[in-house]
Amino acid sequence: KSSIITNGHYLENIRPFAHSVSQVGISIDSFEDETNIKEGRECNGKTISFENLRQKIAEIRQTNPNIKIKINTVVNEWNYNEILADKLAELNIDKWKILCQKPFGENKGIAPYQFYAFLKNNWYASKKPKSIFIENKEAMFDSYLMISPDGCFFQTDNSGYKYSRPLTEVMVEDALKEIEFDYNKYLDRYRLVKKYE
């Protein structure tokens, strides 16, 4: 099975081979133009509208009716008071992953109350709460296994990026020892949120 993660701007490019893709993950933090521009979610000055996104998803489903649609939302200082659940319900998505913005460098992330305000507001507005998965800051640290273009495992922490030696030079087992990776936290990322209060 293969999956693709995209910001949605060129989603139509997936359609010709959508029949061979099991899941498409789309990064959507807001449907407000101003919010998307502030956080840099734009392409050549243009943001993706809800209607445009709905049309592109419908076209992909025409090619592959069984394809799973996942939305990834990073809660940040510009969108934490927005409600996306009502519009996402119209898209009939299969999974909605809500992530808390991680501190990185000079960016301190968001306060816990901002993250939980977003969760609470969208939980009660959601028509499919069983499709919601959440990741707070602690859950995100060291729980992703990422590879850079030059073949290095890497992680991020408050100070920036940490890299292993390239996989072309060392065995996978040795490279993993050079970064922080928590396999149990990785598994916990896929737990289903059954209740939020």
Short names for language-model regions:
Residues 103-104, 126-197:
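Accessory C-terminal segments flanking Radical SAM cores
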Residues 83-91, 98-101, 112-118, 122-123:
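Anionic-ligand binding region
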Residues 69, 104-133:
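Short acidic, glycine/proline-enriched helix-loop-strand junctions
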